[in-house]
Each structure stands twice: as structure tokens, then as C-alpha cells.
Design a protein with these regions (language model features):
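Thiamine diphosphate
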Residues: 1-167, 171, 176, 303, ...
Length: 324
């Protein structure tokens, strides 16, 4: 199997699914002749042509609106929003149209639109190129939200998203776009949406993470093996695999949640609520959230803002000593 990074895995997934199903169409800013700002669509314009790899104006609302129309007419569009920070001009189209079409039509019109967008920090992009808006779209309802941490999951989950009948927000973590590498199956390959993965087994505490922060949490756990932490890669944020989370927390009695979005009203708050509802009598300590600060994403202080391995390690050591 080839050794690929996440960008290469995404590119291959798109190529395989476009060959498999001629209804799959790509659209977005600079995705065609240029191959995308991160080169995730490189070569696809030459292979499939301008009618299936479509360069669009810089108008996010228009990109998503066009994708919705394509889906209603039987296509399977995969629009790219160049950075997740720029997804907000399309908020109305995503939340009020895309996420509600199946409900509004009484199930007559599914909208299989997969929105790809790079997410999070890691490139010193400041507050215009580093945000993590997953909680907003999970809250909106009607959308599946996926955030892989590695190339294998990126390919398998993207293929499943494209083949599904639901709208999906597919978040690609920039910090590990090229840094995370692994052997990726060639040809058709899928991973079911909605299934978390136990990355590291343990009995001392449960650590939940996704995207780029999975790697930081993994490093923190490896540096402190006596914590005996069980690390879970959520992979799919919504629908959340709450059963896998529940099983782990009931076993360990302690839970830490790691994400790079701001702490207040971040997705970790919802996970914490679900965990305490299901595991209250099994908890030996309050649930811990290790997250970005409640500030705009800084440029110079990026590494102080992100919950990197040293801060995670410090938090986990404190969690071990916590009592109800």
C-alpha cells in the first residue's frame, strides 16, 4: 500500500469516487486548473474535465447554493470551501437550506452534498485562516460532521460521505495535512460514518480527541504511560458514537475532552453533558475540557493558543488527582 498524507488520501478518494460514479462533481475556488490552494484536487481537472471539476467565483454562498441545486437534480456535488473560516457567507445556505431539505420535503429530497473544508490552526494563518467552527454546524441540525485525523480515515470516511444520502461537513485538519502519513488502501475503500476508534487502550482515564488534536493527545499519553489513558479518536463528530464513549468512561471513571476550538460552548461542552448524563454514577472526578482559549485565534501566539501535548499532559496529570 502507498504511504500517503491526508491531502493525497483525499485526492485519491475523490478520484476513485469520480471514476465509480459519474454523478460526483467537484466545485470551488481554484480547485480546477490550479488544483486547490492545498493541492487536494491536483490533476482531477485534467482527468475529468471542466464539467466535473468546476472553478467558481469567490462566493461561498453561491458555491453551496449551486451544490444544493445540483443535488436536487440528481448529482452528488462535493464543494470545497477554501478555508473553514470563510464558510460563514454560506451559513444560511448550509443551515436553512441544505440541512433542512430532507425534513422540509417530507423525505422526498435528500441532499447528498459533501462540503470539504480545511479546519483549525497549524499554518500561522491568524484568525482568518485558523478557526474551528464545528460546534456551530453540529448545533444547526440536519448535518453530519466528520473530522479525520489520519490519511486512512480521511479516504475511507470521505468515500462513505460521498456515497451517502445525507449532507456532510467534512473537516480536514490543516495542522496535519502533510504531517500525518500512513499506508492507505488503493482503490475503493470506505469507513462507516458514526464509528469512533480506540487508538490506545487503558483503564486510568478516557481521553477524547479528533482531527489534529488527536496527535497531540496521543503524544501526551505516550509521554505519561503511568496515566494508563484510553485514547479515542471520535472521527465522526455528528452523529457521535456515544456508545463507544460511554463504554470507555464507565470503565475508566475519568474523562478528558480535547479540541482546538474555543472552550466555551465548544463541542466538548456537549460531549461533557452527554457523558455526565450516561456515566454520572461511574465518574470519579469532574469531566475535564482542554481546548483553545476564548479569544480570537492569534498569529504570533498560535502555539500558546492550541492545546498542544504539554498542556494536555498537564491537564491529564491534574485529572488523575481530581476527586468528586
Amino acid at each position: 500500500m502507498p504511504q500517503w498524507n491526508i491531502i493525497q488520501a483525499v485526492n485519491d478518494a475523490l478520484r476513485v469516487e469520480m471514476k465509480r460514479d459519474d454523478r460526483v462533481v467537484l466545485l470551488g475556488e481554484d480547485i480546477g486548473k490550479f488544483g486547490g490552494v492545498f493541492r487536494a484536487t491536483a490533476g482531477l481537472y485534467e482527468e475529468f474535465g471542466e464539467t466535473r471539476v468546476i472553478d467558481t467565483p469567490l462566493a461561498e454562498g453561491g458555491i453551496i447554493g449551486a451544490a444544493i441545486g445540483m443535488a436536487l437534480y440528481g448529482l452528488r456535488p462535493v464543494p470545497e470551501i477554501q478555508f473553514s473560516d470563510f464558510i460563514y457567507p454560506a451559513f444560511d445556505q448550509i443551515v436553512n437550506e441544505l440541512g433542512k431539505i430532507r425534513y422540509r420535503s417530507g423525505g422526498q429530497y435528500p441532499a447528498p452534498v459533501v462540503i470539504r473544508t480545511p479546519v483549525g490552526g497549524g499554518i500561522k494563518g491568524g484568525h482568518y485562516h485558523s478557526q474551528s467552527p464545528e460546534a456551530l454546524f453540529i448545533h444547526a441540525g440536519g448535518l453530519q460532521v466528520v473530522c479525520p485525523s489520519n490519511p486512512v480515515d480521511a479516504k475511507g470516511l470521505l468515500a462513505s460521505a460521498i456515497r451517502g444520502q445525507d449532507p456532510v461537513l467534512f473537516l480536514e485538519p490543516k495542522r496535519v495535512y502533510r504531517a500525518a502519513k500512513g499506508e492507505v488502501p488503493e482503490g475503493e475503500y470506505t469507513i462507516p460514518i458514526g464509528e469512533a476508534k480506540v487508538v490506545r487502550e487503558g483503564k486510568g482515564m478516557t481521553v477524547l480527541a479528533y482531527g489534529a488534536m488527536l496527535h497531540e493527545a496521543e503524544a501526551a499519553c505516550a509521554e505519561t504511560p503511568d496515566l494508563d489513558a484510553e485514547l479515542i479518536d471520535l472521527r465522526t463528530l455528528w452523529p457521535l458514537d456515544i456508545e463507544a464513549v460511554t463504554r470507555s468512561v464507565r470503565k475508566t471513571g475519568r474523562c478528558a475532552i480535547v479540541h482546538e476550538a474555543p472552550r466555551s460552548c465548544g463541542f466538548g461542552a456537549e460531549i461533557a453533558a452527554l457523558v455526565q448524563e450516561r456515566c454520572f454514577y461511574h465518574l470519579e472526578a469532574p469531566i475535564l475540557r482542554i481546548a483553545g482559549w476564548d479569544t480570537p485565534f492569534p498569529y504570533t501566539l498560535e502555539n500558546d493558543y492550541l492545546p498542544l501535548a504539554p498542556r494536555i499532559q498537564k491537564g491529564l496529570l491534574e485529572l488523575r488527582e481530581r476527586r468528586p
